[in-house]
Curated annotation (Swiss-Prot):
The gene is dnaK. Keywords: ATP-binding, Chaperone, Nucleotide-binding, Phosphoprotein, Stress response. This is Chaperone protein DnaK. Residues 594-614 have a biased composition (Low complexity). PANTHER family: HEAT SHOCK PROTEIN 70KDA.
Length: 626
């Protein structure tokens, strides 16, 4: 069995954490950073870039770079078309998860097979199922889907080690907002209530800065930058940077040279100064949207502000001073806890939950809730709720319904999620039919409908005719838009791409090695011209040119062959130098050895586990020392 990790799959950044010796450790990625940008790019040469490398090339590859895909997960109408192939949000998310998995495996030195993945507390069933599908496509066994505020409270609460504490988690990420109230005591983490807004996050603050900049530029130059994709990508990056700087400075300069050109093809520059006061003014309505969910959570939990013991801020967007000030205002002046890293605490909690599920962490029980009510459509289009929001999960509820018409042979069960009174105003999760109902006057048949929500928050619905015993069940996964066959296909596709990526990386290593060998060999020849005959120099140069020529093409075997030839000529050069120096009684064998060694190193694959580095011992000297 491989290792289990906790993953915070974020809108802007993602984090992976693992338990080591019972303590959670955040794993740095291959670039050395503890957070990985949730960005995926398809380069023109077919390479798939993930993380910082994808983010770095976004300006020059706008149409083939995908960011903030989390905002689309669970939406089966969304996809991105790259080279005539459509990718779903699950597939793009899987690319991010694959990188986190690879980086964790590199750090641990062993396979990672299992994961707990976090989602916003206010994610719908479709979004949860889609996230689980993404994990499966990435080659992970998803142990549990956990709400982000719950994971944060788990990490924070266990660290504090206090009894009976009420924690408010205010989670403002890159694309979503959640607020949750939890009670922690004696190893039990129980969610009392949760609320939020899946369409509110740091991206919206960035967009306000972008809008402000485009308006300013249009006023100054009469040019609409929104029609220029490359300019807009530069503006988005500048806006994010400005937002971050305004968390610690009163103002920031936004300077973008050569942002576009005028009618006469003269380059134009964007140069603006944005103050924190102005930034807060243009984003005040976004901040105010977090007030209602906060008040709703208190109401649903039936507690007052004074009952809150600790306030935990989660998500990079909570670093904005205006957010901190609002939270203090809403909580009656309580100072938010500064002891947790808002970017990492969710992944840490996920790793702890993975430890709980794998039996590595004892005496911890996590009791989460369903964020939205679940029910079915009944006569007149009414939403009849079977499970109210903020019900602790896993849970199971049943209710008996009847037919609306005489001799009705079947009933259509339509499952909805939401808080509106009319079913059509809520989110349709799925539908199925129960047939074979015995003929009877309306109101006589008894149809028992059972809702079963598992620990991942994923819904199973069963309808049973008590008279005939006929039964039908649906696992609500339609919302993710993927059948098991599609998921299996995507898993195979992801595995194939992993092989492609590995092959491409190996090919690049061959190229790098070849280029290095040509450079080192030519440098050696240049440094030792007087000691190497012209005939040998010509042979070495001819072989080096062969490598140069091979590097112009795509035939890796041809490059390897050319490298082997150059390696052989280099070793001949080294041999010639040894013989020449021996004849002259010289002591420059080290230089000759360098020539041969350079050829041998560059022409061989050092990945062979049976090859070891060793010092060369002079046998005569060795005997003299005895």
């Amino acid at each position: 069995m491989g290792r289990a990790v906790g993953i915070d799959l974020g809108t802007t950044n993602s984090v992976v954490s693992v338990l080591e010796g019972g303590d959670p450790t955040v794993i740095a990625n291959s670039e050395g950073s503890r957070t990985t940008p949730s960005v995926v790019a398809f380069s023109k040469n077919g390479e798939v870039l993930v993380g910082q490398s994808a983010k770095n090339q976004a300006v020059t590859n706008v149409d083939r770079t995908i960011r903030s895909v989390k905002r689309h997960i669970g939406d089966d109408s969304w996809n991105v078309d790259i080279d005539d192939k459509k990718y779903t949000a699950q597939e793009i998310s899987a690319r991010i998860l694959q990188k986190l998995k690879r980086d964790a495996e590199s750090y641990l030195g062993e396979d990672v097979t299992d994961a707990v993945i976090t989602v916003p507390a206010y994610f719908s069933d479709a979004q949860r199922q889609a996230t689980k599908d993404a994990g499966q496509i990435a080659g992970l066994n998803v142990l549990r889907i956990v709400n982000e505020p719950t994971a944060a409270a788990l990490a924070y609460g266990l660290e504090k080690g206090e009894d009976d504490q009420t924690i408010l988690v205010y989670d403002l990420g890159g694309g979503t907002f959640d607020v949750s109230l939890l009670e922690i005591g004696e190893g039990v983490v129980e969610v009392r209530a949760t609320n939020g807004d899946n369409k509110l996050g740091g991206d919206d603050w960035d967009q306000r800065i972008v809008d402000w900049l485009t308006d300013k530029f249009k006023s100054s130059h009469g040019i609409d930058l929104t029609k220029d994709k490359m300019a807009m990508q530069r503006l988005r990056e500048a806006a994010e940077k400005a937002k971050i700087e305004l968390s610690s400075s009163q103002q920031t300069s936004i300077n973008l040279p050569y942002i576009t050109v005028d009618e006469d093809k003269n380059p134009l520059f964007l140069d603006e100064t944005l103050s924190r006061t102005e930034f807060q003014r243009i984003t005040q309505d976004l901040l105010d949207r977090t007030r209602k969910p906060f008040q709703q959570v208190l109401s649903d939990a039936g507690i007052s502000v004074s009952d809150i013991d600790h306030v935990v801020l989660v998500g990079g967007s909570t670093r904005m001073p205006a957010v901190t000030d609002l939270v203090k205002e809403l909580t009656g002046g309580k100072e938010p806890n500064k002891g947790v890293n808002p970017d990492e605490v969710v992944a840490v909690g996920a790793a702890l939950q993975a430890g709980v599920l794998r039996g590595e962490v004892k005496d911890v029980l996590l009791l989460d809730v369903t964020p939205l009510s679940l029910g079915i459509e009944t006569k007149g289009g009414v939403m009849t709720k079977l499970i109210e929001r903020n019900t602790t999960i896993p849970t199971k509820r049943s209710e008996t319904f009847t037919t609306a018409e005489d001799n009705q042979p079947s009933v259509q069960i339509q499952v909805f999620q939401g808080e509106r009174e009319m079913a059509s105003a809520n989110k349709l999760l799925g539908s199925f039919e129960l047939g074979g109902i015995a003929p009877a006057p309306r109101g006589i048949p008894q149809i028992e409908v059972t809702f079963d929500i598992d620990a991942n928050g994923i819904v199973h619905v069963t309808a049973k005719d008590k008279g005939t015993g006929k039964e039908n069940t649906i696992k609500i996964q339609d919302g993710s838009g993927l059948s098991q066959d599609e998921i299996d296909r995507m898993v195979k596709d992801a595995e194939a791409h992993a092989e492609e990526d590995k092959k491409r990386r190996e090919e690049q290593e061959v190229r790098n090695s070849a280029e290095s060998m040509v450079y080192q060999t030519r440098k050696f020849v240049d440094d030792n011209k007087e000691k190497v005959s012209q005939d040998i120099q010509d042979k070495v140069e001819e072989a080096a040119k062969g490598v140069d020529e091979a590097l112009k093409g795509d035939d890796i075997e041809a490059i390897k062959s050319a490298v082997e030839k150059l390696s052989a000529e280099s070793q001949e050069m080294g041999k010639s130098l040894y013989e020449s120096e021996a004849a002259n009684g010289g002591t420059t064998g080290g230089a000759a050895g360098a020539a041969g060694a350079a050829g041998a190193d560059a022409g061989s694959d050092n990945s062979d586990p049976n090859v070891v580095d060793a010092e060369v011992v002079d046998e005569d000297k060795k005997d003299d020392d005895k």
